[in-house]
């Protein structure tokens, strides 16, 4: 099996190295990843300047572009044949709830899906320091999870699986839960401050967070020490609203 690995934290990221170790027994690995941090780039493409892939090894490339660029170039230009699976991650931080709208990690997997390739996005639901400390202990659990997911007798069509790993040592992971996206609400997420010259600047990020603890949500699973697996797809149509259009829609 031919596996494409990418991420949004960059080619040198700890999480990518852990993913390589966990996935090496799946088959032939090809790594095509950004040459620098590309977090929160979502599904953006580089359209207004050329991209320069740099070959670092027999099956290893870095690209001066976004995670989506990396997957597109890998599948359309760099690999001799398309991969059987796209694996993206392991992100240094969670991708749950609304995170998936901004995540370059999820976007890389979504680009694989858009190209017709089964895909899995993986994220560590803790901060960078905890990722550095704990990811090595989770390699065995991640390896088992990947073998299970890629070996499913009927991997769901038109679907990527969004995986979040709890921030606990590998031997404390309690199991796996199939989940839905939860909801997270940020407050005071824009910090106002001054630059060294006294000018106003705004910084996005931080603030307090409230999350949905619904029993079937990704947040609840990870909070309880489980790996969450959430199926996502490209179709953003709100079908419940579409199916009840007679209740609210009026022809202009």
From Swiss-Prot:
UniProt keyword terms in alphabetical order: Cytoplasm, Hydrolase, Metal-binding, Nucleotide-binding
Cofactor(s) this protein requires: a divalent metal cation
GO cellular component, one term: cytoplasm
Location (main, coarse): cytoplasm
Signal peptide: none
EC number: 3.1.3.5
Catalysis performed (reactions): a ribonucleoside 5'-phosphate + H2O = a ribonucleoside + phosphate
Comment on bound cofactor: Binds 1 divalent metal cation per subunit.
Top-level EC class: hydrolase
Cell compartment(s), UniProt: Cytoplasm
GO molecular function terms listed in the Swiss-Prot or TrEMBL record: 3'-nucleotidase activity; 5'-nucleotidase activity; exopolyphosphatase activity; metal ion binding; nucleotide binding
Record Pfam families: SurE
InterPro entries: SurE, SurE-like_Pase/nucleotidase, SurE-like_sf
Binding positions (a divalent metal cation): 8-9, 39, 91
Recorded family membership: Belongs to the SurE nucleotidase family.
Stated role: Nucleotidase that shows phosphatase activity on nucleoside 5'-monophosphates.
Protein name: 5'-nucleotidase SurE
Lineage: Bacteria, Pseudomonadati, Gemmatimonadota, Gemmatimonadia, Gemmatimonadales
């Amino acid at each position: 099996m031919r596996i494409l690995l990418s991420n949004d934290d960059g080619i040198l990221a700890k999480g990518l190295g852990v993913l390589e170790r966990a996935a090496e027994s799946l088959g032939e690995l090809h790594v095509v990843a950004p040459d620098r941090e590309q977090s929160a780039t979502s599904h953006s493409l580089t359209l207004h300047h050329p991209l320069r892939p740099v070959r670092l090894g027999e099956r290893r490339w870095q690209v001066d572009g976004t995670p989506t660029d990396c997957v597109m170039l890998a599948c359309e230009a760099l690999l001799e044949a398309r991969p059987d699976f796209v694996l993206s991650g392991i992100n240094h931080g969670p991708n749950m709830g609304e995170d998936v709208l901004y995540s370059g990690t999820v976007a890389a997997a979504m680009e694989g899906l858009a190209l017709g390739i089964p895909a899995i996005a993986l994220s560590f639901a803790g901060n960078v320091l905890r990722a550095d400390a704990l990811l090595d202990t989770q390699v065995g659990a991640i390896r088992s999870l990947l073998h299970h997911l890629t070996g499913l007798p009927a991997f769901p069509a038109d679907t990527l699986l969004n995986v979040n790993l709890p921030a606990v040592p590998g031997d404390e992971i309690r199991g796996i839960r199939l989940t839905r996206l939860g909801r997270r609400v940020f407050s005071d997420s824009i910090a106002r401050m001054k630059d060294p010259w006294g000018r106003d600047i705004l910084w996005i990020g931080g603030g307090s967070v409230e999350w949905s603890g619904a029993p079937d949500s990704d947040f609840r699973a990870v909070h309880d020490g489980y790996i969450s697996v959430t199926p996502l797809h490209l179709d953003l149509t709100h079908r419940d609203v579409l199916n009840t259009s007679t209740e609210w829609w009026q022809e202009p």
